[in-house]
Swiss-Prot record:
InterPro entries: C69_dipept_A-like (IPR047804), Peptidase_C69 (IPR005322). This is Probable dipeptidase A. Keywords: Dipeptidase, Hydrolase, Protease. Belongs to the peptidase C69 family. One of its GO terms (biological process) is proteolysis. It catalyses: an L-aminoacyl-L-amino acid + H2O = 2 an L-alpha-amino acid. It comes from the Bacteria. The lineage of its organism: Bacteria, Bacillati, Bacillota, Bacilli, Lactobacillales. The active site is at C10.
Amino acid sequence: MDKKIQRFSCTTILVGKKASYDGSTMVARTEDSQNGDFTPKKMIVVKPEDQPRHYRSVQSSFEMDLPDNPMTYTSVPDALGKDGIWAEAGVNEANVTMSATETITTNSRVLGADPLVASGIGEEDMVTLVLPYIRSAREGVLRLGAILEDYGTYESNGVAFSDEHDIWWLETIGGHHWIARRVPDDAYVTNPNQFGIDHFEFNNPEDYLCSADLKDFIDTYHLDLTYSHEHFNPRYAFGSQRDKDRHYNTPRAWIMQKFLNPEIVQDPRSFALAWCQKPYRKITVEDVKYVLSSHYQDTGYDPYGSEGTPVSKKVFRPIGINRTSQTAILHIRPNKPQEIAAIQWIAYGSMPFNTMVPFFTQVKTIPDYFANTYENVSTDNFYWTNRLIAALADPHYNHHETDLDNYLEETMAKGHAMLHAVEAQLLAGETVDLEEENQKMSDYVQGETQTLLNKILFDASNLMTNRFSLSD
């Protein structure tokens, strides 16, 4: 079998319902391709008749029968499909979400005790195997955990599940073990590509879950690195403290926490950054977009900034990186009619150059502009148009920044207005066609994105190296 595809570059933020501006749970993650690669994406709805009953992986020899009662769910799979499904993020008809996966770190002690399984599951498979069959976030943890125990995994991953009430975060440990923690309601979680959970209570199954033999596994292989053994730190036991982490991972958690808790002074290279924090104020969708677009603004680490040195500007990996494929914010809102409670905000391409677009998820189809991505570059779909804007704007980012900011603000305002209008119509007893509303949102965004591309191309052409100020 060919070498497995690994997308070890994602960034996750989770927002508990008492930490969010509207009482919602929010799960968000950038899906980033490996260095030197770009992965076209599309957003679709998977109906029960389209869900496989016998699943076969492309990346490994894994296969299994699936239940015959799948629910409809949204998905953001690879557009070309040659490497497998890679569904990544979605909401099912029970308004339960799943985001998979955040590739995380491990260590040789763990792998020596429970090696990875070449024939197991990976990021390619997880959403397809779990999301259509779960009716709560907790059920998602338990279903994925059972599959991990039975079949194993060939990579280390973090996975988020949410519903109206709870967010759960699961991290794999070696080939067959796993651990999960419920996100505190008044907190947010920042998780770059490293093992994150830093506190666990074995005697509190309401908020903590794990594979059945995890305590014995820890004791047998001397994995608990704390002195007292009273405060178990899974990150010490199962994670890493590598030089690479200080440049690739910890700075991303630091910059998110710097924005959401500016009163806390921390070191971007610290291995002690908390997995979860209570923000200084409630967190909005716009905040989530901002932190997932971060390139260390207003620090010496910003590759586009005026501060710092040529060395400092390249020392840390940005969150808003060039090779982001798609970003989803899975937004489950309380006290709303069931058919509009779940919103999937979607973006394609590099985050500093794009916008987040909200779609109702209890539908049968997604507009073509977001669902019909193909291999060749085109302005007929949202993915490639965003890629073109980013590539054109990047060399002169500061020149284009105002246009990009205006586009973001105007399109997200339109998104909020659409959500408010539909809710008002339903409360007034009117019938609303959610697919039609999604289409109107798509049409609006398509027009605004084309206008932005026109402006960016015009300005970028006037900034070309071979320009000359005189003409006949």
